Amino acid sequence: MSVKRIAVLCVHTSPLAPLGGQKTGGMNVYVRELAKELSRRGIGVDIFTRRIDAGLPDIDTSLEEHARVIHVACGPPQYLDPIEVYPHLSQFTAGVLAFATRQGLRYDVVYSHYWLSGWVAYKLKEVWNVPIVHMFHTLGHMKHRIGAGRALLPDVRIATETQIIGWASKIIAATPAEHAQLLWLYRADRRKIVVIPPGVDLERFQPIQQLEAKQRLGIDRNLLLFVGRIEPLKAVDMIVEAIDLIRREQNELAEGLSFMVIGGNLANPTEPELSRLRQLVKTLGLDHLVEFLGAKDQALLPLYYAAATAVIVPSDYESFGMVALEAMASGTPVIASEVGGLAFLVRDQETGFLVPSRDAAALAEGIATILTEPEKRRLLGQNAVALAQQYAWPKIVDQLVAVFDDVSARCCTNRHRR
């Protein structure tokens, strides 16, 4: 049985939200690109997300012909931290049910993203009797283990995640590492888990001559690049400390650097992590080497990736690492922490370097190698492009559609048996 229409739940953040802002990043890209590829195949996709602005339309059709973004009331129409969204999930569920009733729609599958959406998916399943496919993107147990998110009541999150594993027909794990974490930390049924990584838009992210990209951006130094949310978990401070180490030991090399940070809300100077990083840069006397650019339109990212000598992803935890994949597709080596999905995605000494997390000295060594060995950098970039080809979105969606078709067919068979 081939699915015709899918309900995608992305409760706390919209695929249309600007990247690099509050709680926007890889998941937003994933949901957006997934919907576009499904739409191209003639599969209807309705993405349900909470209304964060009273001025947003009820239905946004700008994404693709067969893909719509539905804005649903869920608490006050403003940004809320995920844990603040939790008490409003019943309102969100009611809004989704009302929309489907008004439109006279029946969905073949519910594909939910993040733990908040999984809770809603179960409530919809009770009414619609359709299968749930779920992707966590990040796991509460993992964030709790590294000390992140404790203020966000992880017990509530972890309890809900455990329930979702029981409710769902299939769980999509981004990497074998996440598969193992689900088995180890949540005692998940291994028969439910399918490893399917996120994809990358190879038409958007492809090699551009580095000199051309640097000229178009007005960059005349060796560019080190970070792209992502500005939060402690992303460990941007490790890059700053690594640059300081290089300056102490190889000042001439450091003075030829430019470290650019893409992400964060520059309009909010009191943003805690951004303020902390700026103070660190000032204290170390690196103001002339470090530049905070704020969020950038994704259309510009290919130029920045291509202009970079290396893209650095020093996170304490990443379930996958979309930025690393985009950089690789652009032909730029990645220096990343050997954690989670990054350890799966980046091949050490082949497409970039893996270093221990929170190790500024190891990070500095990797940066220095990239800067001083241009032939090594060229080969790493060449290998990265080749590896990225296997993550083309059409290939990834082929695998996902096979899962959707399978769970839909099984659900249909079970209905007939009743």
Describe every region a protein language model picked out.
Residues 348-349, 353-360, 369-374:
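Conserved acidic donor-binding segment of nucleotide-sugar-dependent glycosyltransferases
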Residues 271-296:
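Nucleotide-activated donor-binding/catalytic signature segment of Leloir-type glycosyltransferases, i.e.
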